[in-house]
Each structure stands twice: as structure tokens, then as C-alpha cells.
């Protein structure tokens, strides 16, 4: 029996279990797990484990921090807004420089990727609404939203390090929301530095997994 796997590509396999009555029946739940693991592996390969996106986001936060010091919080917000819009294009550009394969059209995690963009816009709206009240609190609240957003990346990429990244940003946002003068720097600098650190960790883990796969 020929079965077409729904990955978006013409990948046909001979299902020997269906043809052999002595073989145990297929377990749909187990096959679903295999499919989701393949989808996650495809995302990791296409986006280097998500490291370029985290790197681009870190640059956006650092650019906003520079704008905050030079021109003020309002310019920092618009810098972060523009930088946020450029995260995906820059991440894709970096991926193409590494000649990464594209995600297949049938990948079930593609929709999750689009859904993960919505909190970004929600966070920007929340931050914009809080700007007249407190610039520090506005950026801290946005950091909280971004931290929560990263939690979904653990499912998208099959990478638990995103739980740690989300928790760190959530802690940073909470700390600066409670105590804006906690450190002699803006929350934008701390968030940007944290994202660049995790981007390096994510890229290192992805590169190590590629090396293991090549050696196997």
C-alpha cells in the first residue's frame, strides 16, 4: 500500500505493515508524534533553530535603547516598532546566507508561526497605550509580552531553551515594571543583551545538532 505523507512534497513510501496481516496495526498517536517531530526538525533546519530571529530582535531592542538615550522614549518606541517589522526579513536573509532549506507548504507548524506574530502587535499596542503613563513601564510590559511569546517557540522548534528565554524576559519585564530604577540602565538594554546571548546559545545548539547528524 502506497501512503503519501502530508509534508507538502511528493514523498511516497511503501507501507509494509498494511500489507502484512501479522504486523501490529499502526498507532495513529505515535504517527502524529513522528509527524510533529519531523515538522519541528524542518523548522529548525529552515531557520537555524530560530537563532537569526532572536538575534534580529536583540538588535532591535539595542537600537531602541540607543534611541532612548539620544532622543527619548518616544523615539525608542518607534525604533523598536520599525525594528520589529524587520525581524522576519532579516532572519530570512540570514537563513538564506546559510543556504537553509525552505519549510514545506504542508508543514503543520507554519500556522503556529503566523499566530506567534499576533502577540508582537498586541505588545506594541499595550506599550503605546502605556507610554503617556510611564515609558519604563511601557517597555517592561512589552518585554513581558515578548517573553510569553517565546514560550510557543519551544513547540515550534522543539527546542526547550525557548522556555528559559521566555522565563528570563518575563523576569526582566516584571523586575523593571516593579522597580524601573532597578539598574542604572534601561530595560531595553537588558532585554537586547539577553536576546543576543540566547541567540548565540541557540545557534550553538543548532550547529552542534547538525554536526551530530553529519557524523551519524
Model features per residue range: what roles?
Residues 23-45:
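Short, Lys/Arg-rich, polar N-terminal cytosolic tail immediately upstream
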Residues 161-216:
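Terminal transmembrane helical module of multi-pass membrane proteins
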Residues 44-53, 106-113, 131-137, 154-163:
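Short, amphipathic, aromatic/basic-enriched membrane-interface segments that mark the entry/exit
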Residues 120-170:
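Membrane-proximal helix-loop-helix units in multi-pass membrane proteins
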Residues 58-69, 119-129, 150-151, 169-180:
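Hydrophobic alpha-helical transmembrane segments and adjacent interfacial helices
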Residues 53-112, 117-118:
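Selected alpha-helical membrane-embedding segments in polytopic membrane proteins
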Residues 39, 92-106, 148-156, 199-207:
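C-terminal ends of transmembrane helices
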Amino acid at each position: 500500500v502506497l501512503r503519501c505523507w502530508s509534508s507538502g512534497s511528493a514523498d511516497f513510501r511503501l507501507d509494509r505493515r498494511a500489507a502484512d496481516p501479522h504486523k501490529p496495526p499502526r498507532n495513529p498517536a505515535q504517527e502524529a508524534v513522528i509527524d510533529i517531530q519531523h515538522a519541528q526538525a524542518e523548522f529548525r533546519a529552515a531557520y537555524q533553530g530560530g537563532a537569526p530571529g532572536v538575534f534580529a530582535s536583540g538588535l532591535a531592542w539595542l537600537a531602541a535603547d540607543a534611541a532612548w538615550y539620544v532622543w527619548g522614549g518616544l523615539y525608542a518606541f518607534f525604533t523598536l516598532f520599525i525594528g520589529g517589522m524587520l525581524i522576519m526579513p532579516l532572519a530570512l536573509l540570514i537563513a538564506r546566507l546559510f543556504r537553509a532549506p525552505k519549510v514545506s507548504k504542508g508543514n503543520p507548524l507554519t500556522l503556529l508561526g503566523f499566530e506567534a506574530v499576533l502577540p508582537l502587535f498586541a505588545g506594541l499596542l499595550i506599550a503605546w497605550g502605556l507610554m503617556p503613563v510611564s515609558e519604563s513601564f511601557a517597555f517592561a510590559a512589552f518585554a513581558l509580552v515578548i517573553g510569553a511569546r517565546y514560550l510557543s517557540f519551544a513547540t515550534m522548534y522543539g527546542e526547550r531553551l525557548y522556555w528559559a528565554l521566555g522565563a528570563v524576559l518575563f523576569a526582566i519585564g516584571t523586575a523593571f515594571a516593579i522597580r524601573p530604577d532597578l539598574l542604572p540602565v534601561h530595560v531595553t538594554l537588558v532585554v537586547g543583551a539577553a536576546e543576543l546571548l540566547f541567540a548565540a546559545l541557540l545557534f550553538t545548539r543548532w550547529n552542534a545538532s547538525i554536526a551530530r547528524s553529519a557524523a551519524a
